[in-house]
Amino acid sequence: QYYTYKKENTKHNFHELKGENIVFRYPGQQTPVLNGLNFTFQAGKNYALVGENGCGKTTLIKLLMGFYRPESGTITIDGKNIQEMDFGELQSFYSAIFQDFNHYNYTIKENIILSNLAAEKQDLNMESAVQQAGFGAWQSDFSKGYDTMLGNLWEEGTHLSGGQWQRLSIARMLYRKAGIY
């Protein structure tokens, strides 16, 4: 069973993200990755998921974002079960960067603003996100500034280092201004 996608992507604030007795196992696996996990995250506070490789940190994030569904247990945002939300509504709460962040063959500006095309004052918000992410230090390296094409699909495409792509992904996440990141 998959989430539906009905609504336009609007931003939502939240007060509490809660998981109760979460169990998740990958198909074909006997042992659950997460077994009876409970948590409560309050808005405005910082939390860190810490653990060994393979202990379920990324799995939990993907559960929270609706990419996976728990075998049992509930995840709620302000008391509403996320499985009752359509995918667009659920995604409006989150902004995340995974280990395999995306490299888009667009301009620098397009790479950043695609996370929130409806934002007002795009240039001002984009500049703030770029500076916070530490990507602005390379701005002088790009002949066309934020209009520089990235990637190898374009003849004039500029290639970025892994670290530069990572900072660009962080700028994209910050530009989105989601309540949970």
Predicted regions and their residues:
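Pre-NBD coupling/linker segments of ABC/ABC-like ATPases
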Residues: 2-12
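ABC-type nucleotide-binding domain
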Residues: 10-181
